Amino acid sequence: MPTKQRRTLYPDEAVEAARRNVEQFEWAKRRREEAVEEADRYLEGYGGLDGLWRLVTSQEIPRSCTVSFKNEAGSPITGTQFNEEHGSYGWEADPFEAPWKLTDPTCEMQFPTNDFGAYYESGLDEAGEFDPELADDDLLVNELYPERGESWGVDDGTGWVDDEGNRYHFVAYYNHWHCWYEIREILQALRDAFLLDGDRKYAQAGIVLLDRVADVYPSLDLSAWGPEAELYNSDAMSGQGRTMGCIWESVQIRSKLSAYDAFFPVMDDETAVAFLSDKADVYEIEGKGSGDAIRKNVEEGIVREVLPAVECSQIRGNFGHHQAALAMAGVVLDEPDGYTADALAHVFRPGEYVTEDDGTPWGRHEVTGGDVYPHLVEVVDRDGQANESPNYNAIVTRSVREIAEVLDGYDGTDEDLYEHPKVERMLGSRIPLLVLDRFTPHIGDSEETGNPGLNLDEELLVDAAARYDDPQLAQAAALAVENLDEIHGDVFDPDPERHAEVVQETLDAEGPLDLPSGNLAGFGLALLRQGENSGEPDETDDRRVAWVGYGRNSGEAGGSWHNHLDTLNLGLFGYGLNLAPDLGYPALGSTTPKRRNWAASTVSHNTVVVDAQPQKPQWVSEPKQFASTGEVDLIDVAAPEVYPQADEYRRTTAMVRFDDERSYVVDFFRVAGGEEHHFSFHAGEGEATAEGLDLLAQLEGTYAGPDVPRPGFREDTEYNQEVGNGFNYFDAVERDEAPPDSFSVDWDIVDTWDVREDGAEDVGVRLTMCNDLDEVALVDGEAPAKPGNPERLRYLLAKREGEDLDTTFTSVIEPYEGEPVVESVELVGVEAADGEEVDSEAVRAVKITLDDGRVDYAIRSSDPSRTYLIDDEIRFQGFFGVYREEGGEPAAAVLSDGTELGPEEGEPVLETDRGRLAGTVADFTRELAHENEIVVEFDGDVAEPEIEACVGEWIYVETDHDRNGAYEIQGAEIEGGQVVLDVGDRTTVRGYVDPEEPEQGFEYIPEEGAQFTIPRTYAWD
């Protein structure tokens, strides 16, 4: 008898609600129609039950997600042109009309050239499973292109090897995408059609397909195909998996589990039982004589397989993937005192992924526990981001939500992840990354080179908006859905319209999403925003954004291999475009030489390379200043870990408002230490023109040298292995080996992704640099060879060299449309008020003349305690300031962490007794909580108005571990001799004392007695 006795994912009352919704609401009716249409397409295309049953292949047909290993060879005909035009997965197929055939879209030729379908049928054994020993080798003949030779393009399942030694897995690729991946799509379509429509024919087909999968699933094992098979799967090079690599398997298995729950009540269906009984008579297959026998087969062959497969890493993905699969398996089987308890215990058990060389080709792999709570507490940061790139973090969030959703309402457990503070943070974690209502910063392995896309989960946001009291969730849900009439709850919700009411009430009260400047100090990302949301994401949108990334940059420091060594990377958005895009996702998401040495390396990003080597790993940098005044938005971040030889590696970036539609960015990048500094910057696709430089073209080679060639698509060169800094991926080199102290480079931006209707013909980015440099070069760097990407981008490389080098790269960067508003930029003199010597790198000031006659001074000082005379006319004491003159008179000023800013003659326009508050931490929230506090004691007397003025500022607590102590102050109250600072939903918890024994308590980000500062920012207009 089967164990399962009821539906648990889709209980009867939920199915009844769904069918009522289908009758009542147009959106639900459309969903049913779409599911039915898709299911009917599969039923017709595969010719009914028999075609679906035969779609399931067994272990002896390998699986590979690319045709050649890591897509190295591309196409047998057009080579890597295939990769550039169609990506890694661009082979075309028509399973209904031409099964087992792939079409190369670059030449329209088909592969394999033999009739593999006939060969496959000839090799079926008594169980209906393929055995190559039984197959007719006479069918392994090139039938399509005999002029190329009898064996050319022939694949027996193990691939075809060309004359150059490249192996092409046509059959394995087809089996991966058009058998097993297709099975997932079919089961989902049949499941949804049956649940929403009720027609038994969809359940009959689903039962037949699911039962056949259960026949073969226990024997499927990717690791049986050793490394020599040159198969490539989503397995992180572990070789583990079932129908496909272990990462994607953790998603694939869920469609099978949910299908079993959906079809469970009707598995006694006479048509399905009769069909499977007939198959059992033809083949040596047992257990098809009744609905309960079929249920038992599915439970034993699929559901109970999940726990051991997770334990041995055959099902293991990014965090949340396999945990969600295992939680679903436990809930579906519904055995609270047995398998369900074991499965959920593993999901929440502290544990890790363990590998060991045991002499076998792939080694031993084990997942000792799902580690859900330790991971949420220790790895997911206080901003709700996991340790991957943002797009992968979004996947993690969806998987964590699926765990929560599977357990929500299930009476076999008390676990409720929706109550966990980190889960609430995760569900809204995508929102602060949204830019111009159409972009997100492309950090790490994310997206393409400059493409639009929000990657918002509509269902997640709509549900979260109804679940939590956070207006931004509702605003983001409206943005994701676009058409407000389409906002609703899940189709299985008995009251799906309440979600629309929540969203509409929020929009009526708050308006559309219009994010202010923000600093995600836990994740490591600051976004400086100016302009307002017009409500229309088109070319009239005047919002502009500069961002600086400073989060996890490597799997070696708490991150993952989807991170890049890109600390203090700078990006720009404006005029509806991504104006300084990161390269995005490499052509292959693997550790290929080009990814390692170029796309994920430091020099391909808008940051600084020290000593011609990539950065070292870090968890997160240390923000020192963040401020937003309306006229000036500021971020200052130090990254002491990424270059240990540097005493300072720190970027200070400010966006300065010109008017309602235009801004410019002033950027100070201080590097103290090392012997060679390379400032790297690129804007979007477009011609780059230099002014003030005398550039000489280098006719051969790369930036690494005229005798160092650029590596091929998959080539790992001697330079890569011995140097590995990515300089050899720059070509089309032009150099000025004696550059002036000031020059500019102007990029004429191309609307690569056709975002704007007018093509953005007059949009540009101009960078003006004021530095004593040893060399300036303009070079080309390739974007990943993926459809839609630009072929290459033009980079500026500014170089300084010398012993114990100290550099503050000083730039003004202006996005513009039409004509720039910045007419000139010049470095101006700085003198100390006390007459002492001034370190010209420690304090810098630039004079920026604007096209309306106004003049701005931007000043940065490493020593805020000293007073300086700027350009013989401005007195300044502080860390950062912007001083604007109009007609020779003061017009506006912003001062951060300082006490004085104003004309040398006359009264200061900004003056205060202290630029910062300081003191020690007395206490803080010591548990995971939705609301958190830091209790402080100030040094000296601080008046109540000063304390109240801290709201909106940031506290920076010194830490001695890998997390920074930066928190936004959302409230401040005096209690006795202490001040309680409200830091909102950002937790003070860093991790468990011992993840194996959570009852021992937590470790914290702040510590009692730690020093802190609260820099103040003042504005005058």
Q: Can you describe what each PLM-predicted range is?
A:
Residues 174-428:
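Aromatic-lined, polymer-binding surfaces characteristic
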Residues 7-15, 221-224:
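An acidic-aromatic substrate-binding cleft motif
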Residues 92-174:
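Long, low-complexity, polar/charged, intrinsically disordered or flexibly structured peripheral segments
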Residues 1-3:
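Basic/polar N-terminal segments that are highly enriched at the extreme N-terminus
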Residues 62-63, 74-80, 84-118, 128, ...:
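Long, internal stretches of domain cores in catalytic or enzyme-like folds
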Residues 10, 14-23, 27-48, 52-54, ...:
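Extended polysaccharide-engagement surfaces of secreted carbohydrate-active enzymes
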Residues 155-182, 216, 601-606, 630:
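N-terminal accessory/precursor segments of enzymes
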